[in-house]
Amino acid sequence: MQTLADLLNTIPAIDPAAMSRAQRHIDGLLKPVGSLGRLEALAIQLAGMPGLNGIPHVGKKAVLVMCADHGVWEEGVAISPKEVTAIQAENMTRGTTGVCVLAAQAGANVHVVDVGIDSAEPIPGLINMRVARGSGNIASAPAMSRRQAEKLLLDVICYTRELAKNGVTLFGVGELGMANTTPAAAIVSTITGRDPEEVVGIGANLPTDKLANKIDVVRRAITLNQPNPQDGIDVLAKVGGFDLVGIAGVMLGAASCGLPVLLDGFLSYAAALAACQMSPAIKPYLIPSHLSVEKGARIALSHLGLEPYLNMDMRLGEGSGAALAMPIIEAACAIYNNMGELAASNIVLPGNTTSDLNS
């Protein structure tokens, strides 16, 4: 069995030759050069991913939802009862939550993973990777040990790679956990170097009069735990949570197979920041779905160098944005594979210097 270090060191590089071929092919399609904008760039990005063998396409689709509770809930940083995590996880097994409906619309399977729900017994229908019944309270202790973080990362990476072996070529990430925007903000603040006040938002409708306490909790967590911003695992272990570790694991697992992974909202941006610290080579495999309205979203995305495809004023989480954006990926593949070519119609457009569309 490969170790975590082995997997982090074997992320395949994007294939520039495949991307160049894709660029020439797209420039020769029945349209003015560049007229499909970011859809063209997306198709070229996909062509460079080794797991797709140079041809943008979508096989099976999967959204992996990491579910966990957080000890920092005790600090009054969320208004929802902690029990809602377990209740909503069970609802996901029935297909009635937002991500389940949107994933079904997109033709994607939802994998609901218990990585740290605070319930006495495992919840039927969930994939059980539970590390503990919730993470530590980051305002007074680390979220988890480094060993716990590394083991969960490896477990999720292996699960993701197994899905890829079974035909999944497009992954989406999601999460579920009351109070989880607090550790996410702590991660974003730590890695970007921005003050907590700049990145802490209202999460799931936290009253504005409670926002100062949430900012203070994040600041205390960082001061107490002293996470190393250059060490993604250290950041996740000290001020993160099991759901955030799980999301990072999906990203690393998909990238290790040379396959794309759709980000969701603020939680996924935070996990991506940590994952990119572990292995910068995964960045070209990350596709941003939508711009979360959570306060620190733009700061995190700017640090990642990513521009979302959608701006829908969404902040549900769960993987809802990732599921919603899956048809955009399929559209990029469709134009690449199904549009006709200028040469076949004897059309010559000014500025089109494509000489060999199939080279």
Swiss-Prot record:
> By its UniProt entry, which CDD domains does this protein fall under?
DMB-PRT_CobT (cd02439)
Which GO MF terms does the UniProt record name?
nicotinate-nucleotide-dimethylbenzimidazole phosphoribosyltransferase activity
Task: Provide the leader sequence positions.
Answer: none
Class of enzymatic activity (EC top level)? transferase
Q: Which InterPro entries match?
A: Nict_dMeBzImd_PRibTrfase, Nict_dMeBzImd_PRibTrfase_bact, Nict_dMeBzImd_PRibTrfase_N, Nict_dMeBzImd_PRibTrfase_sf
Protein keywords: Cobalamin biosynthesis, Glycosyltransferase, Transferase
EC annotation from Swiss-Prot or TrEMBL: 2.4.2.21
Active site per the UniProt annotation: E318
Name its pathway: Nucleoside biosynthesis; alpha-ribazole biosynthesis; alpha-ribazole from 5,6-dimethylbenzimidazole: step 1/2
Catalytic reaction annotation? 5,6-dimethylbenzimidazole + nicotinate beta-D-ribonucleotide = alpha-ribazole 5'-phosphate + nicotinate + H(+)
GO terms, biological process: cobalamin biosynthetic process
State what this protein does: Catalyzes the synthesis of alpha-ribazole-5'-phosphate from nicotinate mononucleotide (NAMN) and 5,6-dimethylbenzimidazole (DMB).
Which PANTHER family does the annotation name? NICOTINATE-NUCLEOTIDE--DIMETHYLBENZIMIDAZOLE PHOSPHORIBOSYLTRANSFERASE (PTHR43463:SF1)
Identify the NCBIfam families for this entry. Answer: cobT_DBIPRT, PRK00105.1
Assembly notes: Homodimer.
Family that this chain belongs to? Belongs to the CobT family.
Q: Any idea what this protein is called?
A: Nicotinate-nucleotide--dimethylbenzimidazole phosphoribosyltransferase
Ranked from the top, the taxonomy reads: Bacteria, Pseudomonadati, Pseudomonadota, Gammaproteobacteria, Enterobacterales
State which gene encodes it: cobT
